[in-house]
């Protein structure tokens, strides 16, 4: 985690100095999305036996329409053999951006997708809880059966049916043991 954090901090400082945090963040997000949707390209960029010149050529094609800073940054990662850590670097970079902009990431897990109205209500409630702007990342997980699980930083609020059933099971175990 130390090395990816250093790379993320370096890019963040560059974005801040050039007053291009939004543009660089958007380009970095696009790069990550492209790599996630094309696993073969990611493998090629990460595989140590592939020639660096070939990796840079692929990187140029992949990032041709992105900010120059991201294009150069990817080449530095290729030179330093750190492309396999891109996802972790990206997550850390986004954390730095959120901190700078006083935004909190809230991960919301529900058994079914939320509609716009439900999402807005949850966002308003979470904004009150975190005393600031929130960025919601939603996922669906049918195993929670019903309800909602919210993660804000290192705090988890489990209001799911699965969580309640697990809690009840633990209470019953304790009752059985002490009886």
Curated annotation (Swiss-Prot):
Keywords associated with the record: ATP synthesis, Cell membrane, CF(1), Hydrogen ion transport, Ion transport, Membrane, Transport
Subcellular location per the Swiss-Prot or TrEMBL entry: Cell membrane
Domain of life, per lineage: Bacteria
InterPro entries cross-referenced by the UniProt entry: ATP_synth_OSCP/delta_N_sf, ATPase_OSCP/d_CS, ATPase_OSCP/dsu
Cellular component, GO, one term: proton-transporting ATP synthase complex
SUPFAM superfamilies, sorted: N-terminal domain of the delta subunit of the F1F0-ATP synthase, V-type ATPase subunit E-like
Its membrane topology: Peripheral membrane protein
Coiled coil regions, renumbered to chain: none
Record bears the keyword Transmembrane helix: no
Molecular functions (GO terms): proton-transporting ATP synthase activity, rotational mechanism
Sequence similarity: Belongs to the ATPase delta chain family.
Function as written in the Swiss-Prot or TrEMBL entry: F(1)F(0) ATP synthase produces ATP from ADP in the presence of a proton or sodium gradient. F-type ATPases consist of two structural domains, F(1) containing the extramembraneous catalytic core and F(0) containing the membrane proton channel, linked together by a central stalk and a peripheral stalk. During catalysis, ATP synthesis in the catalytic domain of F(1) is coupled via a rotary mechanism of the central stalk subunits to proton translocation. This protein is part of the stalk that links CF(0) to CF(1). It either transmits conformational changes from CF(0) to CF(1) or is implicated in proton conduction.
Assembly, per entry: F-type ATPases have 2 components, F(1) - the catalytic core - and F(0) - the membrane proton channel. F(1) has five subunits: alpha(3), beta(3), gamma(1), delta(1), epsilon(1). F(0) has three main subunits: a(1), b(2) and c(10-14). The alpha and beta chains form an alternating ring which encloses part of the gamma chain. F(1) is attached to F(0) by a central stalk formed by the gamma and epsilon chains, while a peripheral stalk is formed by the delta and b chains.
Protein name: ATP synthase subunit delta
Gene that encodes it: atpH
